[in-house]
């Protein structure tokens, strides 16, 4: 074999190995999963033969886990908060401590639309905004502005003598828009 052929085959082999390494899947990091929760749930709920005893054991182990406060990282909270920004940090932390991973918390939020508050947590009361009613009235008032009154246009006499050409064009434009709207509304009825 020629030396260039050997060099070509070697380069192809190195390229193949390099591409194989680049395409191989990255092993998942368990950054968002709490391992000891899944171990406790698998041993706590399947070992008992009596269903009543099983529920008691599971609830006791769940309470002890809640009291011991599992480590929930800030990155876990940030991931959930980026998906559901209306949730409080306490709601997210409580649900992450309960479920053990971000995926279950996000799924629960998607199904329920909200997450439960921790026991004993008092929901912060948002102060009532007394300015909501005046704002609504302002919006309604702004919507019902009559352009004929605003620009002093006489609908009965559209060709009145005004000095400004701009004013006349504006008047014609507003009257034309009113006529088109009236025609459109009469066609719909």
UniProtKB/Swiss-Prot annotation:
GO terms for cellular component: endoplasmic reticulum membrane. InterPro entries: CUE. It is found in: Endoplasmic reticulum membrane. It is a single-pass membrane protein. Component of the endoplasmic reticulum-associated protein degradation (ERAD) pathway. Recruits the soluble ubiquitin-conjugating enzyme UBC7 to the cytoplasmic face of the endoplasmic reticulum membrane where it functions in degradation of misfolded or regulated proteins localized in the endoplasmic reticulum (ER) lumen or membrane via the ubiquitin-proteasome system. Residues 1-5 are lumenal. The chain crosses the membrane at residues 6-26. The gene is CUE1. One of its GO terms (molecular function) is ubiquitin binding. Residues 27-189 are cytoplasmic. Residues 72-114 form the CUE domain. Residues 117-131 have a biased composition (Pro residues). Belongs to the CUE1 family. Forms a heterodimer with UBC7. This is Coupling of ubiquitin conjugation to ER degradation protein 1. It comes from Candida albicans (strain SC5314 / ATCC MYA-2876) (Yeast). Residues 38-73, 117-138 are annotated as: Disordered. Keywords: Endoplasmic reticulum, Membrane, Transmembrane, Transmembrane helix, Ubl conjugation pathway.
